[in-house]
């Protein structure tokens, strides 16, 4: 039997530079990725460098609040 909650949880990563640069009117939206993280290994918020199709470059994607 499993004790408590599962260690793996599904998270959503969102582009941080798209949120700051809302100046572009022709923006195709905000880039979001869905992934999983292990809560025991990384208890803090996750930040990864991923490709953003709206910015056309690699940017930092941060974990959204639940």
Swiss-Prot record:
Name one molecular function that GO assigns to this entry. Answer: structural constituent of ribosome
Recorded name of the encoding gene: rpl33
Q: Which GO terms describe its cellular component?
A: chloroplast; ribonucleoprotein complex; ribosome
What name has this protein been given in UniProt?
Answer: Large ribosomal subunit protein bL33c
What's a BP term from Gene Ontology annotated to this protein? translation
Main localization is plastid
Q: Which UniProt keywords apply?
A: Chloroplast, Plastid, Ribonucleoprotein, Ribosomal protein
Which species? Morus indica
Q: What Pfam families does the record tag this protein with?
A: Ribosomal_L33
Answer yes or no on keyword Ribosomal protein. Answer: yes
């Amino acid at each position: 039997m499993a004790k408590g909650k599962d260690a793996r949880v599904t998270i959503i990563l969102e582009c941080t530079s798209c949120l700051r640069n809302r100046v572009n009117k022709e923006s195709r939206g905000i880039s979001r990725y869905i992934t999983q993280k292990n809560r025991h290994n990384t208890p803090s918020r996750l930040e990864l460098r991923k490709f953003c199709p709206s910015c056309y470059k690699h940017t930092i994607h941060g974990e959204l609040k639940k």
